A protein has these predicted regions:
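Positively charged, low-complexity intrinsically disordered leader regions
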Residues: 33-38, 42
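Conserved N-terminal alpha-helix of the aminotransferase class I/II PLP-enzyme fold
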Residues: 41-90, 115-122
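Short conserved active-site loop signatures built around small residues
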Residues: 2-31
Length: 138
């Protein structure tokens, strides 16, 4: 599906599951209620956990339903890939861990959510500044 431009409505329905479910021929994305997956042998497991072979290894890390969701959100937002997390706090943590480093200084609004403020100042131990909106020189 990546070769042709699809309309927004089509992306909502089809991206991430271009073919019907092979086990059931269902058009809708199945919700797999599992946490574990079968490996053909120990080498297969080693390759999966070593990230040499793409595929599911444990339900909290990856699963088919989540993969379709991530692909659809990425397509709808015009992105390359997506990452789904279980909460807003997890999303904030992932975002900050990927853009901030040791000794960085963050500038944010003074009404920043308390959980985010504590994550930045206490967990990450970063400097935090909340300038006045009137102070355009800062």
């Amino acid at each position: 599906m990546a070769t042709k431009k699809l309309h927004f409505e089509t992306l909502q329905v089809h991206v991430g599951q271009e073919q019907a479910d092979p086990a059931t021929d269902a058009r809708a994305v199945p919700i797999y209620q599992t946490t574990s997956y079968v490996f053909h042998d120990s080498q297969h497991a080693a390759d999966r956990f070593g990230l040499r072979d793409a595929g599911n290894i444990y339900g909290r890390l990856t699963n088919s339903t989540q993969g379709v969701f991530e692909a659809r959100v990425a397509a709808l937002e015009g992105g390359v890939a997506g990452l789904a997390v279980a909460s807003g706090a997890a999303a904030v943590t992932y975002a900050l861990q990927n853009i901030l480093g040791v000794g960085d200084h963050i500038v944010a609004a003074d009404n920043l959510y308390g959980g985010s403020f504590n994550l930045i100042t206490h967990t990450f131990c970063l400097l935090y500044t909340s300038p006045s909106p009137r102070d355009t020189e800062r």
